[in-house]
Each structure stands twice: as C-alpha cells, then as structure tokens.
C-alpha cells in the first residue's frame, strides 16, 4: 500500500520506482535529514546571536527568512527538481534563521524570565519524535489510508486557521485564544502538537514505502525535506506551548 501523506514534500507519486539502478535507502534518507537539520541549527545559532547583539534585527530576520523560506519551499514542491539539495539546503538555512530569531523573541520578550524555554522546547521536540518513532516501529499506530485522511484534514484545517490569523493580524487583531496563555490557548497548542506528532507517523510511512518500492535515489532528499518540515513545525508549536505554560 502506498500511503497518501498530508506533507506535500512526501507526495506518493514522487516515490514511484524508476528505471535507474540508484534506489532510495533508509540510511541515505537519515543522512540527508541530519544534514538539513545541521543547516537549520547553524542558521538558528547565527540569527539568535545576531538578534542578541541587536534586538532590532529580530523582526526583520523573522519576516525576511520566513518569506524566503516559504518561497523556496513552494519552489521545491512545484518545480520538483531532480537535484533538489541546493534549494533544500537554502531553505534549511533560512528556516534556521527564522527559528533562531523567533526563539530569541519568545524567550526575551514574550516572557519575563524565560531562560531555559528553548532547551525545554528542544527536549520536548526530541521526546515526541523518539516516542512517535517507537510507536511507528512497533506498529502501535499505522498510517492507514483512513488515518492519513484524518491527519491530512486536521493539518489542512490548522494551516487555514494560521492563514486566517495572519490576515487578521494585518488588520490589527488575531484569532481569539490562539496565542493566549489561558486553558483554551494551552489546549489549542496541545492539539496542534498532537497533530504534528501524528504527521510524523505519516511521514515515516511514506519514507518506508519509498524505500520498499525502490524510489529513485533523489527521493531521499524529498523524504528528508518532508521530515524536516514536520520537525520544524513541531518545535515551533512546542516552543509556543512551553511559553504559554511559563507565562
């Protein structure tokens, strides 16, 4: 069975086996995932340090890197280059720049005494990833078509909500409770983190099927890219949750 992922970087048709002898492997996908995460980390550390020295850069970096990363992600998903590593590497760096600036702003401006919040969010993200990997490995949750359909619908709804919130932000307001630190706001963050965690199961399933059905070697990059997209989203949601709990 080929599962339909809610992650556009892991679309099923990308993982069809080709006529060449170079095939997608799990080790190759893991290595490429680690490479992209390393670039995200480098970008994050650079922007965090830059914003710490000049806080006025925070919003500029967030907007510039956020928009740049969005454009590159769309380019990768629409163009589908045979050698996507350059665009994906550029995306990872920009995403890292965004995360670094965002993390600094949350730690130093959203909270008073927010020291340690970034480490807590990182630990939480790693814990969720390892938990879902274990759950997937032992077949506790399987990415069946019905499961993927539900997750896809939830992810789509969340993205629409964020888009609507962004539009409202342009007019000086936001969706009620979305960013609040009360019980409803915390509950929303927990729901979003749960959906992101379930999306990891979908991504694991798609990558496994790519390896199983002999997808082309360059699909390792797409598998890694999709996984990094999910992990970045998970970290951002985890950081928001920890901030709300500490507020």
Regions found by a protein language model. Give the residues of each.
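A hydrophobic alpha-helical transmembrane-helix feature that marks the membrane cores
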Residues: 1-247
